[in-house]
């Protein structure tokens, strides 16, 4: 069993250190806001531009257009566009934990601030749990919060009820509220793995950013018409992520053995 007072101590320690960094603050605050304002701005532009109200079927891959049914082409174009921008909300749970873990862990290596903590009765599991939560919690709060802001602001752009229904569909609800946290867990454990071997937080951050590639592949796959996100694909992805997360947690636990930290983190 975890001693949650110890876990809370670790979380407070991590936040006190990493939130002093401007790069971390930018990633947690400004980046999610930018990712939220971009799709809202595009929807507002489409809604206010009379010349674009008719829509163009050439803007939408045939495989995606088939999912629109009898919707007006302009609505289908908006749904397709929103579908692309919504993938930004799956980048946030990756980028935020990576930044927090990179600057937190590499900072501990350079300042040797972790060694005194290891002299306390805290267990390795509590240490990892606290470090993981300190990176995952801000990522999940930022992602969920910005998505809710997006949902509340979308009607102000003048979209139809059909477009609004798609945005609030089970596909994206599951993606944001299920896939998001799972990706955050993967990101923080991968960042722990990379940061434990890096001497510069920027290097650790850049290497860890490779996790963004699967999301980018989905984005380009949708643009090309090869992939159409649906509930089934989201659930399959969730199962795969659970397995990968478990493997990464085991790997992180192996890296954070006390003797490894004390002898190699010099």
Residue ranges: model-predicted function:
Residues 50-71, 76, 149-177, 228-230:
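Membrane-interfacial helix-loop-helix connectors in multipass membrane proteins
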Residues 1-32, 265:
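Aromatic- and glycine-rich beta-strand/loop motifs that create alpha-glucan
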Residues 18, 97-116:
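Transmembrane helix boundary and interhelical loop/hinge segments in multi-pass membrane proteins
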Residues 92, 97, 124-153:
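Selective transmembrane-helix segments that form parts of the transport pathway or gating/packing helices
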């Amino acid at each position: 069993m975890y001693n949650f007072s110890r876990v809370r101590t670790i979380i407070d320690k991590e936040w006190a250190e990493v939130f002093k960094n401007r790069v971390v603050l930018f990633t947690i605050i400004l980046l999610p806001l930018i990712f939220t304002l971009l799709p809202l701005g595009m929807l507002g532009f489409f809604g206010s531009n009379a010349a674009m109200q008719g829509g163009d079927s050439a803007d939408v891959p045939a495989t995606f257009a088939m999912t629109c049914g009898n919707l007006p082409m302009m609505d289908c174009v908006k749904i397709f566009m929103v579908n692309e921008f919504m993938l930004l909300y799956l980048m946030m749970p990756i980028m935020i934990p990576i930044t927090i873990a990179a600057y937190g862990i590499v900072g501990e290596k350079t300042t040797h601030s972790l060694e005194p903590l290891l002299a306390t009765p805290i267990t390795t599991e509590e240490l990892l749990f606290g470090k993981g939560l300190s990176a995952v919690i801000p990522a999940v709060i930022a992602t969920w919060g910005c998505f809710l802001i997006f949902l509340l602001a979308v009607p102000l752009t003048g979209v139809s009820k059909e477009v609004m229904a798609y945005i609030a569909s089970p596909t994206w609800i599951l993606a944001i509220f299920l896939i998001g946290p799972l990706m955050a867990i993967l990101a923080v454990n991968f960042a722990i793995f990379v940061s434990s071997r890096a001497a510069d937080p920027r290097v650790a951050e850049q290497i860890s950013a490779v996790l963004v590639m699967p999301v980018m592949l989905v984005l380009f796959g949708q643009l090309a018409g090869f992939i159409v996100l649906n509930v089934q694909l989201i659930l399959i992805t969730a199962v795969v992520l659970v397995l990968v997360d478990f493997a990464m947690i085991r790997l992180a636990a192996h890296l954070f053995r006390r003797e490894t930290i004390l002898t190699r983190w010099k």
